[in-house]
């Protein structure tokens, strides 16, 4: 419940632009959020393994 309220709070426009921070759209995590996809690294990894993110595949060399 607390995380959900923080997600709603993050959507509001801050008084100063520098106070804005990114949150994962799926789980609400604050750290390690990929700006391009607006999701955290953990959710990104899960969705990439499931093939739900187009153009993303596991690297192998």
UniProtKB/Swiss-Prot annotation:
* Alphabetical list of InterPro entries matching this protein: Ribosomal_uS14, Ribosomal_uS14_bact, Ribosomal_uS14_sf
- Cofactor stoichiometry and binding remark: Binds 1 zinc ion per subunit.
Provide the residue positions that the database annotates as binding Zn(2+): 24, 27, 40, 43
Extract one GO BP annotation from the record: translation
Q: Which cofactor does it need?
A: Zn(2+)
Question: A GO molecular-function term, please?
Answer: zinc ion binding
* Keyword field contains Zinc: yes
GO CC annotations? cytoplasm; small ribosomal subunit
> Is Ribonucleoprotein a UniProt keyword of this protein?
yes
Q: Which Gene3D superfamilies match?
A: 30s Ribosomal Protein S14, Chain N
- Which keywords describe this protein according to UniProt? Metal-binding, Ribonucleoprotein, Ribosomal protein, RNA-binding, rRNA-binding, Zinc
> What does the UniProt function comment say about this protein?
Binds 16S rRNA, required for the assembly of 30S particles and may also be responsible for determining the conformation of the 16S rRNA at the A site.
Query: Which family is annotated?
Result: Belongs to the universal ribosomal protein uS14 family. Zinc-binding uS14 subfamily.
Subunit comment for this entry? Part of the 30S ribosomal subunit. Contacts proteins S3 and S10.
Entry-linked NCBIfam families? PRK08061.1
What name does this protein carry?
A: Small ribosomal subunit protein uS14
Species of the source: Metamycoplasma arthritidis (strain 158L3-1)
């Amino acid at each position: 419940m607390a995380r959900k309220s923080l997600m709603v709070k993050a959507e509001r426009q801050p008084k100063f632009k520098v106070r804005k921070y990114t949150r994962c759209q799926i789980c609400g995590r604050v750290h390690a959020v990929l700006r391009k996809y607006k999701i955290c690294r953990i959710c990104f990894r899960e969705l990439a393994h499931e093939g739900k993110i187009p153009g993303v595949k596991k690297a192998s060399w």
